[in-house]
């Protein structure tokens, strides 16, 4: 009986998070009311307050949910044992497809500057991303695919490049957004990669762009974490 109750409670919690993610993905945080979320979730305020004390707490839960998912997805890429630079490129396309296909991913980038800034969460998340990518960048330098650069500087540049493209791009035009990601890589590649390896990585980027376009086209945006994975 206890297990059944726990499963129902967890299902309700996920239902609320999905509805909140969809709302936060579409509109600014301050424009979303609890009634909007509860109407979409088809639940009462009592059900929500059992799990979340406030809209702020719910927004933090959406962020935590996506960060856990993204962390696991990036670790899965690292575990594939591709070269360091191939992995860095794959991480960029993974993030792009997540942002295109998942409400939770879209919501997080909307929420972090608003909800995360005051508590230092935004800084922590970005610093953690830079640190994680620095480890992969260090491997890429050791493998000779990236010229001798400070791995943390490379990681920070890649994070800034993606966030800038994300801010300026249109996720509702997936192919255009992914082509912009491709062009971003093409622009920075000559400053990172030895001349004798540029052609290989240009071809790798083209293949990854085509794969990402295909994946994004097959997975319309969804809050459900099972849809685009």
List where the protein language model places each region.
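Hydrophobic alpha-helical connector segments
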Residues: 61, 68, 72-101, 105, ...
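Key DNA-contact positions within bacterial/archaeal DNA-binding proteins
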Residues: 46
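Basic, helix-initiating cap at the start of DNA-binding domains
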Residues: 1-27, 31-43, 56-60
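Amphipathic alpha-helical interaction segments
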Residues: 15, 86-94, 153-160, 179-183, ...
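C-terminal peripheral helix-coil segments that are non-catalytic and often amphipathic
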Residues: 130-131, 135-138, 142, 171-229
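Helical hydrophobic small-molecule/effector-binding pocket
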Residues: 86-111, 117-131, 190, 194
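Base-recognition residues in the alpha-helical recognition helix of bacterial helix-turn-helix
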Residues: 25, 49-53, 65
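Amphipathic alpha-helical packing segments from all-alpha helical-bundle domains
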Residues: 71, 116-143, 149-159
């Amino acid at each position: 009986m206890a297990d059944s109750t726990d499963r129902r409670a967890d299902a309700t919690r996920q239902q609320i998070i999905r509805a909140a993610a969809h709302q936060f993905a579409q509109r600014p945080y301050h424009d979303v009311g609890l009634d909007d979320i509860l109407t979409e979730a088809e639940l009462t305020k009592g059900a929500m307050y059992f799990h979340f004390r406030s809209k702020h707490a719910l927004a933090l839960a959406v962020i935590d949910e996506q960060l856990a998912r993204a962390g696991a997805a990036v670790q899965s890429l690292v575990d594939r044992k591709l070269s360091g630079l191939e992995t860095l490129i794959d991480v960029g396309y993974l993030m792009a497809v997540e942002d295109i296909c998942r409400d939770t991913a879209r919501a997080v980038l909307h929420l972090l500057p608003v909800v995360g800034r005051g508590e230092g969460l935004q800084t922590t998340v970005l610093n953690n991303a830079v640190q994680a990518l620095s480890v992969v960048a260090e491997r890429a330098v050791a493998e000779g695919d990236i010229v001798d650069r400070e791995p943390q500087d490379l990681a920070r540049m890649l994070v800034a490049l993606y966030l800038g493209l994300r801010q300026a791009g249109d996720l509702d035009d997936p192919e255009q957004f992914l082509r912009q990601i491709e062009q971003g890589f093409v622009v920075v590649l000559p400053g990172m990669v030895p001349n004798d390896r540029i052609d290989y990585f240009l071809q790798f980027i083209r293949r990854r762009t085509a794969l990402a376009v295909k994946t994004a086209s097959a997975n319309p945006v969804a809050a459900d974490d099972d849809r685009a994975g």
